């Protein structure tokens, strides 16, 4: 029995190495070893009777409903041309500075991550749109391909993210808390990308040139760039956000009719950002409708292109953070919002809906098949005490929490070369989560850390999925540029691989930062005070004892009068000859002390 769990795990690896689909490998391995265990007498015959109930439990999991809604939202936005507009507009904003196109790709990647959340869609969209432009104006090929692949993988860590939804479900934690924990690491990683591009632009200016003047599309009639009005609009929006954040308690007092002294930080942030975005949109809309001429073409373009996706992000994340909606409800509203945006842009039609629904159905079916297979495997694996084997294997690693985290991250890093994040989440995470919890590791921290690790594996050559996505759309033959008429050489696979190396190093630095500074994840979470069971036990033991026994009965209590009935014998409900309580009452008086029972239960729990 002790060797059955490792043999079963090795059997799963053999199934996967033979090339069978992961879902069927999991299910077949679970059924095979389950029936073998029953035949050998290692497992009870009733074990498999629990399988239908577990599968129905999957179907009733409301958290997993967020997956099709989120996928549908991302696909509608991606196919409605939002990425093209964002890249064109932000590219014009940052174009005049060295490295401007690379900065635009990073920021658009972050926005697409917060709206579509699909790595393949982000990488392919930016590869089709921005790579030809970057090659046209002389960007280094390794820098261009690396920044596109790295920015596309931000969809793994920036909320809302499919990876974080599944992590929360498998680790038994709130999706909202997982989103909050991933916010700071996502922004830090984006900042590290920006810092690297800025360093390259300063040290090697020829690798990241600025856009030439003739490539800048949005200019005023007098030839000016239009930046001053954009800066003024941003300043007004910033002032509105600061005002709302500082006076949120006063606003609540005015609305509710009684004094409110404190407002949650999440509410302040969401309300302030929403207010700033709405004010900017109203100013731009009023300027266009009334033809006031207060804003430049660039300022208007930036406002009307950026505001809709930002509002959609606030609709999804804001409602989740404020507790107005569950993650499933928030993402469902996001899908409806994406459809409304596509309608307003005139891009929603039956062809787009069919493509989006078809892709959503395929992904949802893929996830459900893997989850059912993982359920079969985990049922049998738990039956043979597999989790205890994994726990003993990992808790004996040197270094405590840090040693465990380093070993697990190395393992996940290499497994992610061959397995998709869905497969890793359903196979490996349920085995590692209980061990991390036993070691005292915060599971939100653990989940975000593994999500960043999986993001790193998306880019590691030669197995990174993001590199394959980019290779599929990067030019592999020499072609003539339509704008300049120049002959552009092809992008080689080795250029894509070498371009990803600096960003893999940046992501590994981010993993190390999260391991040694968990406050980057847990700092923004609501603090939950843990109960020290030893302190509770000591407190109960030191409390003055209470007498919970029945009070003594008066003499003659319960005895019939001599003139109405014969005396009853003791033991038949009458008092004993000395006037004490009956035997049944004496047994009740000897019952264990409830306080002692609580102490015994706590001691047993600590064991």
Regions found by a protein language model. Name each.
Residues 1-607:
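Alpha-helical transmembrane segments of multi-pass membrane transport proteins
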């Amino acid at each position: 029995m002790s060797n059955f769990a490792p043999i079963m795990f090795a059997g799963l690896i053999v199934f996967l190495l033979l090339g069978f689909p992961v879902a069927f490998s999991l299910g077949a391995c679970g059924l095979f070893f389950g029936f073998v265990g029953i035949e050998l007498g290692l497992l009870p015959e009733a074990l498999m009777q629990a399988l239908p109930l577990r599968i129905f439990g999957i179907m009733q999991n409301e958290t997993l409903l967020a997956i099709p809604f989120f996928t549908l939202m991302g696909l509608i936005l991606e196919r409605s041309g939002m990425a093209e507009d964002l890249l064109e507009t932000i590219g014009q904003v940052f174009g005049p500075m060295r490295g401007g196109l690379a900065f635009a790709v990073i920021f658009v990647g972050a926005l697409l991550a917060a709206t579509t959340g699909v790595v393949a869609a982000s990488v392919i969209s930016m590869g089709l749109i921005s790579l030809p432009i970057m090659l046209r104006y002389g960007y280094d090929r390794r820098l261009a391909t690396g920044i596109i692949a790295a920015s596309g993988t931000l969809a793994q860590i920036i909320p809302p993210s499919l990876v974080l939804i599944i992590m929360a479900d498998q680790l038994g934690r709130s999706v909202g808390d997982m989103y909050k924990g991933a916010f700071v690491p996502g922004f830090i990683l984006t900042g590290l990308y920006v810092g690297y591009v800025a360093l390259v632009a300063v040290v090697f200016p020829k690798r990241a040139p600025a856009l030439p003047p003739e490539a800048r599309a949005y200019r005023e009639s007098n030839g000016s760039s239009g930046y001053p009005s954009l800066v003024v609009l941003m300043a007004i929006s910033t002032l509105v956000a600061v005002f709302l954040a500082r006076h949120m308690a006063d606003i609540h007092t005015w609305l509710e009719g009684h004094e409110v002294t404190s407002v949650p930080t999440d509410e302040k942030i969401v309300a302030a950002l929403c207010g700033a975005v709405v004010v900017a949109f109203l100013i731009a809309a009023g300027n266009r409708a009334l033809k006031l001429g207060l804003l430049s073409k660039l300022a208007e373009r930036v406002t009307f292109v950026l505001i809709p996706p930002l509002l959609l992000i606030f609709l999804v994340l804001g409602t989740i953070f404020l507790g107005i909606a569950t993650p499933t409800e928030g993402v469902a509203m996001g899908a409806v919002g994406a459809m409304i945006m596509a309608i307003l842009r005139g891009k929603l039609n039956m062809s787009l809906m069919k493509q989006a629904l078809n892709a959503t159905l395929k992904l949802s079916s893929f996830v459900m098949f893997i989850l059912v297979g993982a359920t079969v495997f985990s049922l049998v694996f738990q039956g043979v005490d597999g989790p205890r084997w994994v726990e003993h294997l990992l808790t004996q690693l040197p270094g405590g929490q840090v040693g465990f985290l380093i070993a697990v991250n190395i393992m996940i890093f290499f497994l992610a070369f061959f397995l998709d994040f869905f497969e890793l989440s359903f196979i490996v995470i349920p085995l590692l989560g209980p061990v991390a919890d036993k070691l005292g590791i915060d599971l939100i921290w653990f989940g975000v850390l593994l999500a960043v690790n999986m993001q790193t594996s998306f880019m590691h050559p030669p197995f990174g999925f993001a590199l394959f996505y980019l290779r599929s759309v990067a030019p592999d033959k020499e072609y003539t540029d339509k704008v300049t008429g120049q002959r552009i050489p092809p992008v080689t696979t080795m250029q894509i691989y070498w371009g990803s190396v600096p960003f893999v190093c940046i992501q590994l630095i981010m993993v190390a930062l999260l391991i040694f500074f968990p406050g980057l994840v847990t700092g923004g979470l609501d603090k939950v005070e843990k109960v020290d069971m030893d302190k509770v036990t000591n407190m109960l033991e030191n409390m003055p004892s209470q007498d919970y026994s029945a009070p003594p009965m008066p003499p003659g209590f319960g005895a019939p009068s001599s003139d109405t009935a014969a005396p009853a014998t003791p033991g038949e409900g009458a008092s004993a000859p000395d006037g004490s309580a009956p035997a049944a009452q004496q047994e009740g008086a000897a019952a264990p002390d409830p306080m002692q029972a609580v102490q015994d239960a706590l001691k047993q729990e600590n064991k």
